[in-house]
Amino acid sequence: MKIKTRFAPSPTGYLHVGGARTALYSWLFARNHGGEFVLRIEDTDLERSTPEAIEAIMDGMNWLNLEWDEGPYYQTKRFDRYNAVIDQMLEEGTAYKCYCSKERLEALREEQMAKGEKPRYDGRCRHSHEHHADDEPCVVRFANPQEGSVVFDDQIRGPIEFSNQELDDLIIRRTDGSPTYNFCVVVDDWDMEITHVIRGEDHINNTPRQINILKALKAPVPVYAHVSMINGDDGKKLSKRHGAVSVMQYRDDGYLPEALLNYLVRLGWSHGDQEIFTREEMIKYFALNAVSKSASAFNTDKLLWLNHHYINALPPEYVATHLQWHIEQENIDTRNGPQLADLVKLLGERCKTLKEMAQSCRYFYEDFAEFDADAAKKHLRPVARQPLEVVRDKLTAITDWTAENVHHAIQATADELEVGMGKVGMPLRVAVTGAGQSPALDVTVHAIGKTRSIERINKALAFIAERENQQ
C-alpha cells in the first residue's frame, strides 16, 4: 500500500506555526515511507477564504521547502463531485432532506438545553413521509447510525471511542446547495486515496462523523493521528500576543527555514536526546509513535539559539541567499564591499538573525554620515590622534591587502607606541565602522577595504581636530 498524506489548510489567514508543524509531520511521514504528500486548499468558507491567504500559505510552504507531490486541489472546484455523491446517498437512503425551519431548530435547541441535554437534531425529517415541493428549501443530512459506537486507533493518542447516540445527523448540504466542510473532507480523502490523516487535535470530534460517512460510502477509512496544540511559554494557546505566529513573519524577522523546521519538528516529537536534525535525519527518524500527546510550549529563545546555530553551520553561500532579501529590505547597495557569503562569515558569531545581520552591516558597503555619539566621545579623543596617524600610515604601506597583514599593521602600531592593542584598536574600530562594536578588527578593516578604511581614518582625525579646536 502506498502511503499518502495531505495538508489541508483553510485559506482564511496566513500559514501559522501550528499549521506548519502539521504540514511538516505529514510531509515527513510520507517521505519516511516513500509515499506521497498532497496539498489541498479547503476553501468552502466562501466568505472568509481569500486569494491573499492562499498565496500566503503557498509562500510559507515554499519557503520551508515542503514540496508537495499532488495539488494544490481546491474544494470550490469540486462542488459537482460532492453534490453527485450526496445525490447518490439520497438515493441509497444514507442521507435525507430536512425541511425544518431555523425557528423550529432554535426552539428545539433551547428546549434541550433547558432540560440539561446536549443540543442535537431530533431526527424529525429522517422519519417523515410528508410530501414537499421540489423547490421547497431544505438541507441534506447524513443519516448517522443510531446504534453502537465509532472506535478508531489514533496513532498518537491510542484508541478513541464515540457513541453514535452522541453524534448528530450532520448537515452535508446547505439550503443554497453548497456542501459542508466535514462532507467535502470525506470525499476528498476518499478520491485522493489518503491513507493517513495527520492533523490538529481540534479535529478529533470530527473524526467519528467522517468515519461514519466513509463507511456509508463503502470507502476505505484512513488512519488518523491528532497532534496536540502549541502553547505560548505562559501555558496559554499560542496567539499573536506571544509574538510572531505566521511562518513568513519568522522569515521577515531573520530566521532561516532550517531553524524553524528543526524547531517545529522537536515541538512535540523527539529522537533520543538529539536536538539538531538535518532534513534527511528528520525523514529517517520521524515516527508518529514518538509524537507527544501533551501540548508543547513555544520557546522563542530556543528557536533563536537554533537559528544562530544554522547561520554558522550551513554553507555561507547558502545563508547569503537568504540574507540577500534582508539586505534589500534595508536598501543597502552591496556592489562596493565584501561578498555576502564573506559577510556571513564575518558577522555569523555576533548575529542571531539575518535581520540583525543586515541591520549591522551597512558600514561595510556605504559610508556613514557621522560617528556613534557615545563611541566617538569615548574613543575619538585627542589622545587617539597619534595611534590613528601611525596605523593609517602602516595600512597605507601594505601592498598585499590581507587580514593577516592588517593585523600586523595594528600590532606594529601598538608595539611602536608602546601601548596596549586597545589603545589602537578601539579608536580604529570607531574610525572605520562608526560604531563601538564590530567583528575582529583585522578582518573588519580588511573587508571594508584599503582605500575606504584610510579615508575613514582621515575623517576620524578631522573629527578629533575639530573637537580639539572646540575645547
From Swiss-Prot:
Cellular component terms (Gene Ontology): cytosol
Binding site for Zn(2+): C98, C100, C125, H127
Cofactor binding mode and count: Binds 1 zinc ion per subunit.
Essential cofactor(s): Zn(2+)
Motif interval(s): 'KMSKS' region: 237-241
UniProt-annotated location(s): Cytoplasm
Class in the EC hierarchy, top level: ligase
Family annotation (Gene3D superfamilies): 1.10.10.350, HUPs (3.40.50.620)
Annotated ATP binding sites: K240
One Pfam assignment: Anticodon_2
InterPro entries, per the entry: aa-tRNA-synth_I_cd-bd, aa-tRNA-synth_I_codon-bd_sub2, aa-tRNA-synth_I_CS, aa_tRNA-synth_I_cd-bd_sf, Glu-tRNA-ligase_bac/mito, Glu/Gln-tRNA-synth, Glu/Gln-tRNA-synth_Ib_cat-dom, GluQ/Sye
Signal peptide limits: none
Broad class of where this protein is predominantly found: cytoplasm
Reactions this protein catalyses: tRNA(Glu) + L-glutamate + ATP = L-glutamyl-tRNA(Glu) + AMP + diphosphate
UniProtKB keywords: Aminoacyl-tRNA synthetase, ATP-binding, Cytoplasm, Ligase, Metal-binding, Nucleotide-binding, Protein biosynthesis, Zinc
Superkingdom, taxonomy of origin: Bacteria
Oligomeric and partner information: Monomer.
HAMAP family to which the protein is assigned, alphabetical: Glu_tRNA_synth_type1
PANTHER family in the record: GLUTAMATE--TRNA LIGASE, GLUTAMATE--TRNA LIGASE, MITOCHONDRIAL-RELATED
Family: Belongs to the class-I aminoacyl-tRNA synthetase family. Glutamate--tRNA ligase type 1 subfamily.
Role noted for this protein: Catalyzes the attachment of glutamate to tRNA(Glu) in a two-step reaction: glutamate is first activated by ATP to form Glu-AMP and then transferred to the acceptor end of tRNA(Glu).
Protein name: Glutamate--tRNA ligase
